[in-house]
């Protein structure tokens, strides 16, 4: 009687979590406990990722997400790990289930399957990929941090943008432009939008970046401007993907107010004063007895 081999697997993130944030390089670790192995026998464990809802193999760039591990059993009971690293950018909200098969390689030409664990409903084998949600918060001021500024020819608005949930190593572009609050319309100066952008590679999950807008604000007395921002993921430069935005015309933090021009009172016309002939001035000559020391 040959002892049956039992197989039990648990899939997690590298940190042992059952959820992983969607990203371009995600790793699932499957810990496989085997019992009933024959010492000295060569085995191969083969695993792959399944989409739970579809009950179908996960295919990324036309390929199965799979891996294998070959070992010689040094004990009847062993624990081995198989890792799967793949691009999970588009898998937010999906449950992935790891399937495993164990082969006996005693005859390398004819591997024999001796055990498997393929249960699409098994929670232990399931990992949830969660949506990456990028939060954006912006504050617009002038260079000195003021929210109320003088209208003038050369005005700079600085928008300080706080981003959370970025994917480290990903190239992003922040695009911003100025809106007229009362009109809820883009600010056009000489027929052009007042806009700017900033491209960067995220080196942290949370970052603070600044975008500056310099323009002629001569005609904007009393107007309120609101800065709008959109963040794009440039992983595929041909298809930038908008990942978050902050476009709220009522947002105080994003609003700048230009001061009203002070009303200059019109001067009343002065009545014509008749020209008085110039009185000739005598030169100031020191008078005698004046006590002036000559």
Annotate each PLM feature.
Residues 31, 79-88, 160, 208-216:
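Exposed aromatic-hydrophobic patches
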Residues 17-33, 148-160:
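Contiguous beta-strand segments within globular domains
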Residues 86-98, 215-227:
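Short glycine/proline/serine/threonine-rich loop/turn segments at secondary-structure transition edges
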Residues 68-80, 197-209:
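Short proline/glycine- and polar residue-rich coil/turn motifs
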Residues 1-12, 20-21, 112-141, 148-150, ...:
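Intrinsically disordered, low-complexity repeat and linker tracts
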């Amino acid at each position: 009687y040959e002892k049956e081999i039992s197989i039990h697997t648990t899939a997690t993130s590298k940190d042992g979590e059952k959820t992983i944030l969607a990203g371009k390089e995600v790793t699932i670790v499957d810990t496989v406990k085997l019992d009933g192995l024959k010492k000295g026998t060569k085995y191969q464990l083969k695993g792959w990722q399944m989409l739970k809802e579809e009950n179908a193999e996960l295919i990324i760039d036309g390929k199965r997400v799979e891996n294998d591990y070959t070992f010689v059993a040094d004990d009847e009971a062993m624990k081995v790990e198989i890792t799967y690293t793949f691009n999970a950018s588009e898998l937010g909200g999906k449950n992935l289930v790891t399937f495993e098969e164990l082969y006996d390689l005693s005859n390398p030409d004819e591997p024999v399957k001796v055990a498997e664990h393929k249960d699409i409903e098994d929670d232990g084998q399931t990992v949830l990929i969660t949506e990456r949600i990028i939060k954006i918060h912006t504050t617009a001021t002038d260079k000195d941090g003021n929210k109320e500024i003088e209208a003038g020819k050369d005005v700079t608005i600085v928008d300080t943008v706080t981003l959370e949930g970025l994917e480290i190593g990903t190239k992003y572009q922040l695009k911003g432009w100025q809106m007229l609050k009362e009109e809820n319309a883009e600010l056009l100066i000489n027929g052009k939008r007042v806009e700017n952008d900033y491209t960067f590679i995220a080196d942290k999950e949370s970052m603070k970046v600044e975008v500056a807008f310099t323009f002629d604000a001569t005609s904007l007395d009393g107007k309120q401007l609101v800065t709008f921002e959109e963040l794009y993921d440039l992983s595929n430069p041909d298809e930038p993907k908008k990942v978050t935005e902050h476009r709220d015309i009522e947002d105080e933090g994003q609003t700048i107010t230009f001061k009203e021009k002070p009303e200059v009172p019109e001067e009343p016309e002065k009545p014509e004063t008749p020209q008085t002939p110039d009185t000739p001035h005598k030169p100031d000559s020191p008078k005698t007895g004046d006590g002036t020391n000559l």
